Design a protein with these regions (language model features):
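Hydrophobic alpha-helical transmembrane segments of integral membrane proteins
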Residues: 94-132, 183-189
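Juxtamembrane transmembrane-helix termini
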Residues: 32-39, 93, 117-124, 164-178
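Intrinsically disordered terminal tails
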Residues: 1-16, 163-189
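Hydrophobic alpha-helical transmembrane segments of polytopic
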Residues: 15-22, 79-83, 100-110, 147, ...
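N-terminal signal-anchor transmembrane alpha helix
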Residues: 10-36
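Long, glycine/tryptophan/cysteine-rich extracytoplasmic
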Residues: 28-73, 122-144
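Hydrophobic alpha-helical transmembrane segments
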Residues: 70-92, 152-159
């Protein structure tokens, strides 16, 4: 085994715990700030729809915003848990790895789409239309929170790990086949 092949195998071994950690990180990032604004009462909202307003009691905020948030982070929590469980299964059982890597890749793409879609207009995806009707004004301009940005970054990193695992499982086999062909030619001479 060459030095390069040994390094690739060690990195492939780290892919599964990395994907497990990425799935758990997605679950955590959905529960922190996805958007905030400096306008009006300066609300801050998590991916799961929990709104925080400085100086307001939690009961008042919950009464007004209870059913008026979009909760895009809910799908991220579910998909993050799926990624973590499937990565643990792939790490534990090598025969499950091809299907596990496909499922992790698909879930990561969906998380990335949810994250980018929410990142494009946080207020529109975090609050429902009823909030603007109740405020009798347009939704405030919101800045993306660290949870939303982190979700997009983790989804991209998961896709990079999936791509590396797939490519590294295909390329060494092609190299091994070439070496076998060379050896056959050498032996027959």
């Amino acid at each position: 085994m060459t030095k390069h092949a040994g390094t690739v195998e060690r990195l492939r071994g780290l892919a599964w715990p990395t994907m497990l950690a990425g799935g758990l990180l997605l679950v955590l990032l959905a529960q922190v700030q996805w958007g905030s604004t400096d306008e009006g009462v300066e609300p801050s909202i998590t991916g799961l729809g929990r709104v925080t307003i400085l100086g307001a009691s939690d009961d008042d905020v919950e009464f007004f915003f209870e059913d008026n948030t979009g909760r895009p982070g809910l799908s991220v929590v579910v998909l993050g848990a799926v990624i973590a469980v499937v990565a643990a299964l792939g790490w534990w059982r090598p025969r499950l790895r091809p299907s596990a890597i496909g499922l992790i890749g698909l879930a990561s793409v969906i998380v990335l789409v949810v994250g980018i879609r929410t990142l494009s207009d946080p207020a529109a995806h975090l609050f429902s239309d009823r909030v603007s009707e109740a405020l009798d004004a347009d939704l405030p301009d919101m800045q993306a929170g660290y949870g939303l940005i982190g979700t997009v970054v983790v989804a991209i990193l998961l896709l990079v790990v999936v791509g590396f695992w797939v490519l590294s499982s295909v390329w060494p086999r092609a190299g091994a086949a070439d070496r076998v062909e060379i050896n056959r030619t050498d032996e027959s001479s």
